[in-house]
């Protein structure tokens, strides 16, 4: 049986993550308060961000930037700004 959480990103009950995907206190917060769907949305944005800004995960400053963008996206309702990206219109 799947876990249900009140997702802070979606602002509704949704299926929770199966296990903690990120380390530390932030990882616990994500596990307790973010749904699979929201995490999937973040993963898409993260991939675009890493590619656009040419981030290197071996660089501590790049990891810190990515973590801050993740918190902004998942918990503070701020979208990730990716220069030149125009989202597809939904019909």
Curated annotation (Swiss-Prot):
Please indicate if the UniProt record lists Ribosomal protein as a keyword: no
GO biological process annotation, one example: cellular response to oxidative stress
Matching Pfam families, A to Z?
Answer: Iron_traffic (PF04362)
Task: Enumerate the GO terms in the molecular function aspect.
Answer: iron ion binding
Please give the superkingdom of this protein's source: Bacteria
The record's section on SUPFAM superfamilies has:
YggX-like
Q: Which UniProt keywords apply?
A: Iron
Example of a GO cellular component annotation carried by this entry: cytosol
Member of which family? Belongs to the Fe(2+)-trafficking protein family.
The function of this protein is:
Could be a mediator in iron transactions between iron acquisition and iron-requiring processes, such as synthesis and/or repair of Fe-S clusters in biosynthetic enzymes.
Q: Which HAMAP family does its entry note? A: Fe_traffic_YggX (MF_00686)
Name of this protein: Probable Fe(2+)-trafficking protein
């Amino acid at each position: 049986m799947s876990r249900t959480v009140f997702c802070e990103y979606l602002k509704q009950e949704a299926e929770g993550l199966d296990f903690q995907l990120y380390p530390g206190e932030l990882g616990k917060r994500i596990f307790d308060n973010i749904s699979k769907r929201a995490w999937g949305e973040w993963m898409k944005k993260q991939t675009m961000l890493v590619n656009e800004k040419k981030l290197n995960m071996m660089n501590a400053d790049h990891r810190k930037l990515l973590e801050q963008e993740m918190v902004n996206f998942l918990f503070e309702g701020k979208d990730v700004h990716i220069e030149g990206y125009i989202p597809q219109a939904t019909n």
